[in-house]
Each structure stands twice: as structure tokens, then as C-alpha cells.
Amino acid sequence: MFQPQKHTLVWPTKSDKGEPIAHVHYQPLTMGQHRTLSEQHKNNDTQLLRACISASTGLSETEIKSLVTPDYTSIQNQVLELMNATASQLIEGEFDSAAPTLLIPIQSDSGQQKTQYTLKPPTVATTDLMDTHANEWERTIFISSSCTGFSQSELERLSLSDWNQLQERLIDFLQQPAAYFHPKT
């Protein structure tokens, strides 16, 4: 399970309420959060990055702007690293790509906590059906749901690292021949 990480500010600052900020904690965004922020800041990468940093750290825009550049750069790098990592890169110990453990468990639509899922390769019929969807996002959600059994809302609750792990494996399923999946001896 993921433990929120922190950056100790070299140059402490103050919160919007005037309280000292000496440490900034950051945690993974969910796929749904990232998707929403991406839609809100479509044409401005700087605003998107700041919004992601704010969502990950809980810092307001004003608090982010009060950081000195070296502290901001450290936080930015850590948040970007977390956003781009796969769960297997962050989970300690062995990682089963056929039944991945979630870096951050989610609550299913039925209210149960999900800590892992079983991933099954799509059939040819499923990939044909995927191709009938109107755009890339709909195809991605369809194939992700078909191979995991997660609903769209459950997929949106996945941490970005869990989502990245899933997408990496789905790309393997869609592009690699069967020999790629044989157990290594």
C-alpha cells in the first residue's frame, strides 16, 4: 500500500491562513481527477501541471506561487514522477501482472474494497467491438473495463499509477504475440 510522501521545504512558506508550511505531502491523483483536470486545462500545460500539483499536495494556487523556485521544482518533479510511474514501480516485492495488486485500494460500486484485480486478455470479438467506439477515450474505457471487470466509475477511482500499469499491460495484450506471455523459465 502507498504511503503519502513528503518534501521538506528548504525555504518554508505560509499557508493562505498565515500558518507556517515546512513540509508538503503529496499523493497520487486518480485517473478521474487527472482526466477532469486535463479537460479543464486543455490548452495550457502550465495550468494543468499546477492544477495537478495542487490536487496532489493540497496546496492552493496562491500557496504554490509563494514557493521558491527550487522547492517548487522539487515538488513538481516528485508529483510528475508519481503521475508517470506504474504501480509495479512503486509496490515493494513481487508484482503479479496477471492479478495486479492495487497501489491504492478502491471502493467498488457495490461498496466492497478492491485491493487487486484479475486481468484477462481480450478476445478478437472484444477488440472488434472496441474498434466500433467513436473515439480513443471510449475505446480505452471499453477495453479496460472488458479486461478487468471494472466499471467506468471504478476505473476513474484508480490511482494514476494503477491506471498506468493497466494501460501498459493492455498495450501488451493488443500488440504482442502469444510467445511474449509464456512464463520465463
Regions found by a protein language model. Give the residues of each.
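A detector of tandemly repeated sequence units and domain arrays
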Residues: 51-52
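Mixed-charge, glycine-accented linear interaction segment located at domain edges/termini
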Residues: 136-154
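Charged interaction scaffolds used for protein-protein
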Residues: 1-43, 55-57, 61-132, 153, ...
